[in-house]
Amino acid sequence: MSDSSHETPASARFGAAVALSVALVHGVILTGCGDAPSGGSGLAVQTTAAAPQPAPTPTPDQLREQLDRVLEFTEHGRVMSLEKHAAWQLLHGVLAFGPNFRIKSGDQMVVALDWVFAGKPMRGWTLTATEYGVKAEIEPGKLGQGHDDQWLAIISQWQVPATREIVVAGQTYRLRDMVKRSMYDCWNGKEASWSDIVLSTHLRPIDQTWTARDGREWSVERLVSMEAGPIYDDDAGAELINMSACGGTHRLIGLAIALNNYRSQHPEIADDQLAGGWLAAHRRIQWAIRQARDFQNPSGAFSTQFFQRSANSANLDEHLAATGHTLEFLSFALPKSELDQPWVRRAVGYLCRLLERTRHIDLECGALYHAAHGLVLYRMKVYGPRETDVAVAAN
């Protein structure tokens, strides 16, 4: 990885491109995500993916058209299947495109959530019914859930109702039974980025308290405070972010969604009236927005070191992961007026170009679908839903 945006010698660029092409071949075998059309070479893609020259700022109309092309292909041109992929990959597709996201089962296309909620088999989707609610088990590797409440957080971001039925070991439960288990599984030191999303989305009023497995009283604000760190210790807060999964973006996304949900239930509270964990979350979010903008590369890509420092890379996968995850966070954290600023438009344009140039490459699922989710959120917030989204909702 290079930490500089200066021009790289041609020989070094070629060597990095060759190394990447080998890595991408192995990535297709181990972590590829969907059957993409064949053709083209990774070499041509890579030498443009890390180009240091300043990127033009697309017009709003140009960007909307580019977004729609990229999202249409990513949703429908890349197809995942129950035979080739596990819950870790398939649920990332749901994260990007919502509860109607379709996958292959044999020769047929099925709705991923309908399939698994009906109790049909999906590798890595392992639920256990307990007296304290339905628990999604954590599993090693990229098969099953990798973090507490990850599956439920994905589902919650698409406003799937808590009354939705879900079959576990032949018995019918409801999504709220998973929420109940999330409330029970709170303790000091828990990685709560996904729990913040779940509980801030489903609990009304958001200020309610409950007793968790540790026998102590908990609230959404207490979970948020644990994730955000000390209110006025910005160095400690930055360290918490930088040490977290995917450059801190998941922690920040959890904080941003929770704060958005709190504001939705308390529109009378202005930013300068926030207190406790909500104020700490606000401070961490504003810090990260500044870092993302200050460390952005001339190409429009966000730093491959996320919020720590400026960094560029010859590795296409690193750019996809960093810019995709960072845009996803910003799309939750920024209002429409700020998302429409040139610096964000350049990042969106960069990400669209990267995905257009890699249409023939079977990309790693996590980076691909977090990037797609960021683009979906941006498209919806700045321009409104795509026509295909409106048609699906109408049906």
Which stretches of residues belong to each language-model region?
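N-terminal secretory signal peptides that target proteins for export/translocation
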Residues: M1-A12
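Short, intrinsically disordered low-complexity segments
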Residues: A12-F14, S38
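Bacterial N-terminal signal peptides
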Residues: A17-I29
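Preference for long, amphipathic alpha-helical scaffolds in soluble/luminal domains
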Residues: C33-N395
